[in-house]
Amino acid sequence: MKYPLLALIKLYQWTISPLLGPVCKYYPSCSHYGYQAIDRHGAIKGTALTAWRILRCNPWSLGGVDHVPPRKRPRWHEMLRNAWRARKGGPSAAEPAIEGHIPSSPAAETPSHVQGA
């Protein structure tokens, strides 16, 4: 269902939108927002985000920059991953650091004179 909706938005952008001109108060425009929302979040949630955006785009709104929110993993996904790691004996994100050791990134372990300036 996602791809027919994306095709409808593209059809609107190529045919009707050029006739209306730039009337959206937001960046990106409502049609671009809708395309990104449906592409990123799927047909149901993307359509809901698009409808909410179109309702907010009215003569009384101030407009501005309004990007599509990033896709988040469901809460059960993290719980399942932690349970799987615990069963395999690996470290879990929920476990505290051992003996006060804070894991660092590889960049933090590299001496500063080695890194390019």
Curated annotation (Swiss-Prot):
Protein family (similarity comment): Belongs to the UPF0161 family.
Stored InterPro entries: Membr_insert_effic_factor_YidD
Task of the protein: Could be involved in insertion of integral membrane proteins into the membrane.
Record membrane topology: Peripheral membrane protein
One term under GO cellular component: plasma membrane
A Pfam cross-reference name: YidD
Higher taxonomy: Bacteria, Bacillati, Actinomycetota, Actinomycetes, Kitasatosporales
Region (Disordered): 87-117
Subcellular location: Cell membrane
Record's keyword terms, sorted: Cell membrane, Membrane
Name of the featured protein: Putative membrane protein insertion efficiency factor
Disulfide pattern: none
